Amino acid sequence: MLYMEKAKEKWCAALAVFVCGFMAHGYFFTNKISYHDDSCYYFGVGMTFGSGRWALGLIQKVMNKVGFLNYSSSWWNGGLCILLTAVCAVLLVELLQIRQKSYAVLLGALLIAFPAMASLFAYMFTAPYYMFAVLLMIVAVYTAVRYPYGYLPAIVIIAFSMGIYQTYFGVATSLFVLILLRDMEDRSFAQNVMEAFKYLFTLLGGMLLYFLCNRVCIKIFQITLVEYQGINNMANVTMRSLIGSVKRAYLGFFQPIFQDLCGISSHRTIRFLSLIHISEPTRLALIS
């Protein structure tokens, strides 16, 4: 009976993804809209090994071997993304232990209607591959959290996901932090520290394995990494560069309060609302 109740919440999340997905992105699916790279890669997956996306390159080679032609189809690729997002929602309901149908629906709706999804669909030629990378990150976290030695396969899964698209490393990181915060009160301080180090080890292990596989693929396929966004220097990390990255992150976070950010906060009202939005968590923390 309890399993059936949990299944209902998962079905609610998945259904919310399908309904809200087609409502929010139906215009993309019923029209062919190309931005930037999508205009150039109708029949490809874009930069692979040269951008450090060795897993995407390997997937493309396998697809070519079996005769599968990649095409930037709005309906096919968009539908695959909706399906993959629904699977993500189901896993997140279980992972975050959501026990109310309304919250499950909200999770599914937010997951598919988030602005990053609209950006993803702008590059429809590679959208399902990138969504698959998101799913892999969630699977990695689920495996590491649910099973005693799950961090070992999780390391491999994280590395492969980063090999498709490096950006989604933040998905695993954020989920680990959320789970630590959720379980903090139910464990002792020592147990919390042990769990934190296990998750940190999993993340670092996945990143190191990604770089190792990237180096191997570069050697095998005789590829040179491109300079775009500093990809050719992504493994050259120093303490100074880390401090600089943290500084830029905080400056970028608070920038909408003080000045315009890409046209988003050009009006004073928007800046004031940004200030309220940023300061609200601090106020709630002080009250509690």
Model-derived segments and their meaning:
Residues 1-22:
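Start-transfer (signal-anchor) and selected internal transmembrane alpha helices
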Residues 21, 29-73, 196-275, 279:
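Membrane-lumen/periplasm interface segments of multi-pass, membrane-embedded glycan/lipid transferases
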Residues 131-148, 153-158, 175-184:
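Specific aromatic-rich, kink-prone transmembrane helix
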Residues 171-204:
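Perimembrane helix-loop-helix junctions
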Residues 276-288:
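Single conserved hydrophobic/aromatic residue that forms the stacking wall/gate
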